[in-house]
A protein has these predicted regions:
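A non-catalytic alpha/beta surface segment that caps or lines the substrate-entry region
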Residues: 9-10, 29-53, 58-134
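Structural recognition of the beta-strand scaffold that forms the well-ordered cores
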Residues: 128-130, 138-142, 199-202, 247-253, ...
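Second-shell loop/turn segments in exported
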Residues: 56-64, 77-89, 113-118, 154-166, ...
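Extracytoplasmic/secreted proteins, especially bacterial periplasmic and envelope-associated proteins
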Residues: 69-76, 86, 90-103, 167, ...
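Active-site-adjacent substrate-binding region
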Residues: 83, 248, 254-365
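Classical eukaryotic N-terminal signal peptides for Sec-dependent ER targeting/secretion
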Residues: 1-19
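Solvent-exposed loop/turn segments at secondary-structure junctions
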Residues: 114-117, 133-135, 145-149, 205-210, ...
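Acidic/histidine-rich catalytic neighborhood of metal-dependent amide-processing enzymes
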Residues: 157-275
Length: 365
């Protein structure tokens, strides 16, 4: 009996040890799984850019073409395009057609919805172009494609919102074109980062119809932020959503006038603002910026102010924002003079180069 007793205890001890081992392994696997699921949403905070060489920067400057952008991308947008108008539809078709013509293989979607305005229900359509929808993380560049409704003018003129925001739309289209071969490598190169991609968002309904208020403004961004917050990402996920996939939300607005100054609005994205400053200095030092007398002409200083714009619905949900809007605003803001004649092509060309270098560095391309 004694021998059998020792055998039973040994067996019991073995079983208990095995059970504890299995429990430990299982718990470890579950914990590791949860951490793996959660960790990718934290990678944005430690993400580091790959700084381009002088040769890489010169290649960017050589590939971008502001005259081509002006003719092919900007001119078709310089029309009246308030939500629901024929011009709004034409501009959306133009944006989609330009992106779909590229080799990188963008996935283009429209987020169409009905929103209540002071003039009753109107239809709005955001455009979301994603380079690699299966990537967990997205660098987002955004602007609004609609124009403010100013009504008929006695001289027959219409408001075309050149800086607000036809030029930012054209800048994103030119970026996608100029960097097409580089962006294509995200999908095809084994050295690319499959978990990091680029997304371009063109919002509808940024402008107020009557007077800016929480309910009469930001129609498209309010709708899309809410939709992304309730959409699982990656597909099938149970505890992460599309909003969490946004590494950095870069919003362009009121760009195109001469001598803009862009302050840093948010301390938590200061390191990315600092990269823009560094890129501007480097391009200046290489003599690749036109009519640019100072190495820190565009991106300078901090501000305590907060400007209401399409980033607000995302900011309130915890998304990191880099807001590229000049302060002070262009003198032509919300006037009929916000037209092509008051744009400054060398400034737009310079900002194209800075933004394109920034994107390549962020995406480690």
């Amino acid at each position: 009996m004694a021998g059998g007793n020792r055998g039973n205890k040994a067996a019991a001890s073995f079983c208990l040890t095995g059970a504890l081992y299995l429990a430990t392994v299982t718990f470890s696997q579950l914990t590791d799984g949860r951490e793996a699921r959660a960790n990718w949403t934290q990678e944005k905070y430690s993400h580091q850019p790959t700084i381009l060489t002088f040769a890489g920067i010169q290649q960017v400057a050589a590939c971008t073409d502001v005259s081509q952008m002006w003719q092919n991308d900007l001119h078709p947008i310089l029309i009246e395009r308030y939500p629901g108008s024929p011009g709004n539809y034409a501009v959306r078709q133009h944006i989609k057609r330009r992106i779909q013509s590229l080799q990188a293989g963008w996935v283009v979607e429209e987020d169409t919805f009905q929103g209540y305005t002071p003039y009753g229900y109107r239809t709005f359509s955001n455009i979301i172009s994603t380079l690699n929808p299966s990537a967990k993380r997205q660098l987002v560049l955004a602007c609004h494609h609609d124009s403010k409704y100013l009504g008929p003018q006695w001289d027959g003129r219409v408001f075309v919102g050149a800086t607000d925001s036809a030029v930012p739309c054209a800048m994103l289209l030119e970026l996608a074109r100029a960097l097409d071969s580089k962006l294509q490598s995200i999908k095809t190169s084994s050295a690319s980062r499959p978990d990091l991609s680029l997304q371009l968002i063109f919002f509808d309904g940024e402008e107020a119809f009557v007077r800016w208020s929480p309910t009469d403004s930001l129609y498209g961004s309010r709708h899309l932020a809410q939709k992304m917050a309730s959409t699982p990402h990656p597909p099938g996920a149970t505890n992460t959503n599309q909003l969490q996939s946004i590494d950095l939300f870069v919003l362009l607005d009121l760009i195109g006038a001469s001598n803009p100054t862009f302050p840093n609005y948010f301390s938590n994205t200061a390191r990315w603002f600092n990269r823009l400053q560094a890129i501007e200095r480097k391009l200046h030092g290489l003599g690749l910026l036109k009519n640019h007398p100072s190495e820190r002409q565009y991106f300078q200083g901090n501000t305590q102010g907060l400007i209401e714009d399409d980033h607000i619905p995302f900011l309130r949900r915890g998304v990191q924002v880099l807001h590229l809007i000049p302060s002070p605003f262009p003198k032509v803001w919300h006037t009929m003079e916000d037209n092509e004649q008051n744009l400054n092509k060398p400034t737009v060309d310079n900002l194209n180069k800075i933004l394109q270098v920034f994107v390549l560095e962020y995406l480690n391309l």
